[in-house]
């Protein structure tokens, strides 16, 4: 069982499922694409804001770890969004502000999912060439805020 999905952009995304449920394991799972969409949405916001703040970013990743319910329909029950930033003298306050702006103002995926399940937003800042983070933390929205 496999499908091809497309939207207004015209790009085609292969959708598939595991052989245990009749698939050929030949495409992304729909729930994976939801999580990838969330990661992509906030990643584009955060890196754009950091570039405007003239931060010297050499590597940037957003990892989303999503917990799902054990029983069908196996909805997402919680997510941790982890921002991993590597660069030269990256300002921690700039990273925190970029994460805040994405969560509270710009990322529609985050705004929508924040109404459905809790999200924890964490970050790790690495200096170029270092294997351990120079700084780590979390964005905690104000009471009643997004995310």
Question: What name fits each language-model region?
Answer:
Residues 1-36, 47-147:
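Extended beta-strand/beta-hairpin segments
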